[in-house]
Design a protein with these regions (language model features):
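Glycine-rich, basic loop-to-helix element that forms the pyrophosphate-binding segment
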Residues: 59-75
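Catalytic beta-strand/loop signature of glycosyltransferases that borders the donor
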Residues: 110, 158, 179-186
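Short aromatic/hydrophobic "clamp" motif used to bind/position activated sugar donors
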Residues: 80
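Acidic donor-binding loop at a coil-to-helix junction in glycosyltransferase catalytic cores
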Residues: 161-168
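Acidic helix N-cap motif at the loop->helix transition within catalytic regions
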Residues: 18, 42-50, 88, 92
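A conserved acidic beta->alpha catalytic loop
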Residues: 23, 37-46, 84
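Conserved donor NDP-sugar-binding/catalytic core segment of glycosyltransferases
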Residues: 92-121
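Short, acidic, metal-binding catalytic loop of nucleotide-sugar glycosyltransferases
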Residues: 22-31
Length: 215
C-alpha cells in the first residue's frame, strides 16, 4: 500500500489541535503524521509535544500555504493529505480514498460541518478544470499525489486571505490531474468565526481575479 502523509498545520488553535491529531492517529491504515507549528504564540507547542507523531516542525509564521508547503516538503509519503488543525476526519477516510488511487490523482469526500453550523455538502463526482473555474469542487482536506505538489509548485504562499486550496486544485486540474469525490461525509469542517473561509468571502472578487490571472 502506498504511504500516506498527513500534514497538520497549526497557528494559535491549540484548543482544537487534539481533535485533528487524534483523528489522524486513529486512521484504519498507517500514516505518517507531521504537525507544523506556524509560529504560534499560544500553547500550541506544549499541546503538540503531547502527541507521538512522526515529525514536528516549528517555523516562523508565514501563513497556511507556507505551513502546508513546509510539511509536504518533509513528507515521505506518495500521497498527501493536509488537515487543518481545527478540522478532523473519519477513521476510515484514508482507507476509503485509497480505493480510488489507481484511477485518480486527487480524491475528496463529502463534508459535514460542525461547531457553528451543521450543514452537509456533497460534491460533483468527477469535476474537471472547467468546473473548478466556476466554483471550488472539493474541500481543502482531499488526498492527492505528492507528484502534483512537485509539478505545480505547491500552495501559493502569497494567498494569505483564503482560497489557497481552490487555487491549488485549479492549477492541478489545468495540469491534467484527475479528481474523484466519494459521496460520504468523511471530512468534518469546524465552522467558527475565525474560519479562513469567512475572510476569503469578504475578498472574493480580488481573490478570484488573482487566481484566474495565473491560469
Amino acid at each position: 500500500m502506498q504511504k500516506v502523509s498527513i500534514i497538520i498545520p497549526c497557528y494559535n488553535q491549540s484548543q482544537w489541535l487534539p481533535d485533528a491529531v487524534n483523528s489522524a492517529l486513529n486512521q484504519t491504515v498507517p500514516c505518517e503524521i507531521i504537525i507544523v507549528n506556524d509560529g504560534s504564540t499560544d500553547n500550541t507547542d506544549e499541546v503538540a509535544k503531547q502527541f507521538y507523531v512522526d515529525k514536528y516542525i516549528v517555523k516562523e509564521n508565514g501563513g497556511l500555504s507556507s505551513a502546508r508547503n513546509a510539511g509536504i516538503k518533509e513528507a515521505t509519503g506518495e500521497w498527501i493529505l493536509t488537515l487543518d488543525s481545527d478540522d478532523k476526519i473519519a477513521p476510515d477516510f484514508i482507507e476509503k480514498c485509497l480505493k480510488y488511487k489507481d484511477e485518480y490523482d486527487i480524491i475528496g469526500t463529502g463534508q459535514q460541518e460542525f461547531g457553528d453550523s451543521d450543514n452537509k455538502h456533497l460534491f460533483k463526482t468527477n469535476p474537471t478544470f472547467t468546473d473548478f473555474i466556476q466554483n471550488n469542487q472539493i474541500n481543502c482536506c482531499s488526498l492527492f499525489r505528492k507528484e502534483i505538489w512537485e509539478t505545480i509548485g505547491g500552495y501559493d504562499e502569497e494567498m494569505k486571505l483564503g482560497y489557497e486550496d481552490w487555487d491549488y486544485w485549479l492549477r492541478a486540474t489545468k495540469a491534467g490531474y484527475k479528481v474523484a469525490t466519494i459521496p460520504e461525509y468523511l471530512f468534518f469542517y469546524r465552522k467558527h468565526g475565525e474560519s479562513m473561509v469567512s475572510t476569503a468571502i469578504k475578498h472574493h472578487n480580488e481573490l478570484m481575479q488573482y487566481m484566474l490571472s495565473k491560469l
